[in-house]
């Protein structure tokens, strides 16, 4: 069992925390020392953050080793905030502060009048409190209405009256978020949204390490690591961020979306809530891949605003909605397992349409139409990646002769599979392509994958109600590879 932490200044001086190398150590030096130790151990640098091992993380490490303030530039859903929160794992497990201090005063070098008076009065009997790493992380979303008082502080007449202080007394100050983040990490998200005069207020903190409260000549020598996030377009646009502030940010680091479907699936599996503690959930591999590829297709779609980006949250919420639709079906039908189908992606359209911002051309046809196209293209890309293009001539001929097929989204696995078995050659084509899998759920997903791929290539059509039918013949010279909407 570890020894209890000191509770008074005298006990703190006699403990290892009172050693000469611990006194006056800045938070940047603390993070640097812990980061070097983690690098030497070879463990994961930032637990829970995936895909940045060879790109972003080395740059973040360099910034921290250089004791820089830094900014993460990237589109939404690129784990910028997650990465900043992971910095707390580089802080010491416990930090001593003067009990009751609003500015987390160092017992050996207090910066506030409260801290100095407390030590002058109590001496070695000054009570000591301890902060955990999470208590030393302060995060703020920048908005145009954020004021200098919010970040730095203001004179508080009510506090002065209650304490019997003059307004000129430092004890009448109501501290903002930055002083309260002293000896910790302060993260400001969406920096360009901060008003220019408030950005000016950050200058001294970044350059000199101190702040001034209004016109009162109090200077607080803050010890804080400043981190920021921003959208690259906003960050570089003139007028969004003032040049002197940008010049004071030590490192500018660009984030990105997952570079491969396999990596993206790993992230989605980590973040999505699929193990629900009720009926067992088994997601066919092709269904999970199609769901993941929807985001990749969206990032290539010209009718979607790529300056806004397509968040990784799209894949996460999409998979959760897919599982929920399958869960509802399994409960109603009394099935022993929750087995999602590709058809469930269409029931999860709200998870897609709510995550994309459309260009003018996209607004004309609507988000739902584009979302359906993304699903079909994702299915086609999945099939091509796994087995290459499939002609499925018998299947196409059957539909071209006027036949149609509609399998209810609420049908169970056995019923749906029976419906797909009426299409000549479909099950054989799926098995021949190696899409049959281990059970009927995989076989069903393989059937849907083939049909959706044929729809994407305009060899079949799929109505909004889910009915597959023959393709509408197009004029010679028109593309037959990419869908443009529901037939």
Label each region the model flagged:
Residues 277-284, 297-371:
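C-terminal helical "lid" subdomain and adjoining coupling/linker elements of P-loop NTPases
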Residues 268, 291-295:
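Short alpha-helical scaffolding segments that buttress acidic/His motifs in well-ordered protein cores
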Residues 357-400:
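Charged, amphipathic alpha-helical linkers/stalks
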Residues 2-262, 273-289, 302-306, 383-487:
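Conserved ASCE/P-loop NTPase catalytic core
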Residues 65, 69, 88, 296, ...:
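Amphipathic alpha-helical core segments of compact helical bundles
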């Amino acid at each position: 069992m570890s020894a209890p932490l000191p509770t008074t200044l005298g006990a703190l001086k006699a403990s290892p925390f009172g050693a000469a190398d611990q006194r006056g150590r800045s938070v940047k030096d603390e993070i640097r020392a812990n980061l070097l130790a983690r690098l030497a151990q070879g463990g994961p640098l930032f637990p829970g953050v995936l895909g940045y091992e060879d790109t972003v993380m080395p740059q973040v490490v360099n910034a921290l080793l250089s004791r820089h303030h830094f900014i993460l530039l990237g589109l939404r859903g690129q784990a910028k905030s997650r990465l900043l929160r992971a910095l707390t794992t580089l802080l010491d497990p416990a930090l001593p502060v003067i009990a009751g201090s609003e500015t987390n005063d160092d017992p050996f070098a207090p910066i506030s009048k409260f801290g100095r008076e407390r030590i002058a009065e109590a001496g070695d009997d000054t009570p000591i409190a301890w902060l955990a790493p999470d208590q030393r992380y302060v995060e703020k979303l920048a908005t145009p209405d954020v004021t200098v008082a919010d970040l730095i502080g203001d004179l508080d007449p009510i506090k002065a009256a209650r304490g019997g202080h003059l307004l000129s007394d430092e004890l009448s100050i109501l501290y903002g978020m930055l002083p309260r983040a002293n000896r910790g990490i302060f993260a400001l998200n969406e920096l360009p949204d901060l008003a220019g005069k408030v950005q000016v207020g950050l200058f001294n903190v970044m350059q000199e390490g101190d702040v001034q409260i209004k016109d009162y000549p109090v200077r607080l020598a803050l010890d804080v690591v400043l981190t920021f996030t921003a959208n690259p377009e906003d960050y570089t646009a003139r007028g969004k961020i003032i040049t002197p502030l940008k010049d004071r940010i030590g490192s500018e680091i660009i984030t990105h979306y997952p570079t491969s479907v396999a990596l993206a699936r790993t992230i989605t599996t980590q973040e999505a809530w699929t193990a629900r503690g009720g009926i067992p959930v088994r997601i066919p591999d092709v269904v999970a891949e199609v769901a993941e590829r929807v985001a990749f297709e969206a990032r290539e779609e010209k009718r979607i605003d790529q300056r806004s980006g397509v968040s990784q949250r799209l894949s996460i919420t999409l998979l959760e909605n897919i599982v929920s639709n399958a869960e509802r079906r399994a409960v109603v039908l009394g099935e022993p397992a929750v087995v999602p189908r590709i058809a469930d992606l269409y029931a999860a359209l709200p998870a897609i349409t709510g995550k994309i911002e459309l260009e003018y051309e996209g607004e004309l046809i609507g988000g739902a139409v584009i979302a359906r196209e993304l699903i079909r293209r994702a299915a086609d890309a999945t099939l091509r990646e796994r087995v290459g293009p499939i002609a499925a001539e018998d299947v196409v001929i059957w539909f071209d002769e006027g036949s149609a097929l509609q399998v209810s989204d609420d049908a169970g696995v056995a019923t749906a599979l029976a419906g797909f078995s009426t299409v000549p050659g479909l099950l054989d084509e799926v098995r021949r392509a190696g899409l049959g899998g281990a059970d009927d759920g995989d076989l069903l997903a393989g059937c849907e994958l083939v049909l959706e791929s044929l729809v994407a290539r305009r060899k079949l059509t799929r109505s909004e109600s889910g009915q597959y039918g023959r393709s509408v013949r197009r004029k010679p010279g028109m593309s037959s590879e990419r869908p443009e909407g529901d037939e």
